[in-house]
């Protein structure tokens, strides 16, 4: 069984590294990716932007997702927080929050959301990514 992971912030430094490392795993695959509305690559297939196999288009609106997702990784900016958390709540998707700079109110809301969703707050994935690359 494989896990389909959606990455919000997939075109950023960390998002690219994670997406490309997923190509080396059999148990997790990239389902799709999200970027800000100003990203010049919106609408393009991810495999034309990154060195990956995923053919889904880069999106900026979570409502445009029409494929299966098992979990979400957020490595985007805090500007995306509200839309992402609402999407995960609506779809009942577990997510890993690896972005930083959240307000106390946002962190408090995460605590509330964690009563109904599995949430991992991991604001520094540098060590984790290095370990993933070595495995």
Where does each model-flagged region fall?
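Structural motif
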Residues: 70-71, 94
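Rossmann-fold NAD(P)-binding glycine/threonine-rich loop
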Residues: 79, 84-90, 98-135
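Glycine-rich, highly charged phosphate/nucleotide-binding loops
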Residues: 48-67, 73-81
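Extreme N-terminal starter segment of soluble prokaryotic enzymes
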Residues: 1-6
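N-terminal Rossmann NAD(P)H-binding glycine-rich loop of SDR-like oxidoreductase domains
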Residues: 7-11, 15-20
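Structural detector of well-ordered beta-strand residues that form the stable sheet scaffold
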Residues: 31, 59, 96-97, 118-120
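NAD(P)-binding Rossmann-fold cofactor-contacting core
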Residues: 24-50
């Amino acid at each position: 069984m494989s896990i389909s992971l959606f990455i919000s912030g997939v075109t950023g430094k960390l998002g690219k590294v994670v997406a490309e490392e997923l190509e080396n795993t059999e148990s997790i695959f990239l389902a799709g990716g999200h970027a800000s509305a100003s990203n010049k690559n919106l609408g393009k297939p991810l495999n034309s932007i990154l060195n990956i196999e995923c053919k889904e288009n880069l999106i900026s609106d979570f409502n445009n997702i029409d494929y299966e997702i098992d979990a979400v990784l957020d490595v985007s900016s805090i500007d995306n927080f509200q839309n992402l958390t609402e999407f995960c709540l609506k779809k009942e998707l577990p997510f890993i929050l690896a972005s930083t700079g959240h307000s106390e109110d946002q962190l408090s809301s995460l605590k509330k959301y964690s009563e109904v969703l599995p949430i991992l707050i991991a604001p520094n994935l540098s060590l984790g990514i290095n370990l993933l690359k070595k495995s």
